[in-house]
Amino acid sequence: YYPRPHEDMTKAQVIIPALETLLTISGTLERPVRNIHFQNISFEHTSWMRPSYQGHVTLQGGFHLLDAYKLPIPGLPEKAELENQAWIGRPEAAIQIKCGNNINFNHCTFQHLAATGVDYERAVSTSIVENCHFTDIGGTALLVGTFPDEGFETHVPYTPFHEQELCTGITIRNNLIEEVTNEDWGGVGIGAGYVKNIHIVHN
């Protein structure tokens, strides 16, 4: 960190995040976590160390490459014109939710976060994010739904194995999203993968 001309570091208050994830909600397809409501809570200050240790090649939506290389001889049996291979990774999130029902955020603040803010990753249903403020986020503010699994080859078409894995009935409404994707220009304000009956309204 390089202090600005008016800053005195001997008097500065410094916050160094230690955690990459502040909250994890994780059920199973058979027994989802149900009926959790967060209201008027501020979720702040996360880190994301992977880019520092392993580098970072960004893809669309804030996803990244785990590994990639050029094929010595172009072409594979399933794709004759392919010249390179690459494997996808999903970024860390301050709030990670898998296999949940009725997991809601209302009038919450998400700020000073290194990677993704909130991630409804898989098999989340009938949940609402509304009247929230997302700001100063390094990657995507809000990510919803299944994308290729970790380590999936990026050139291979992806389809979820089971419809149960889809996020369904998610409402994202009346949120203020600003100053996001500050560190990862491949990120977005709101990203939706394989979802069903999603409502994104007035953000």
Protein language model regions, located:
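Extracellular polysaccharide-degrading/modifying enzymes targeting complex plant/algal/animal polysaccharides
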Residues: Y1-C99, N104, E150-H155, T159-F161
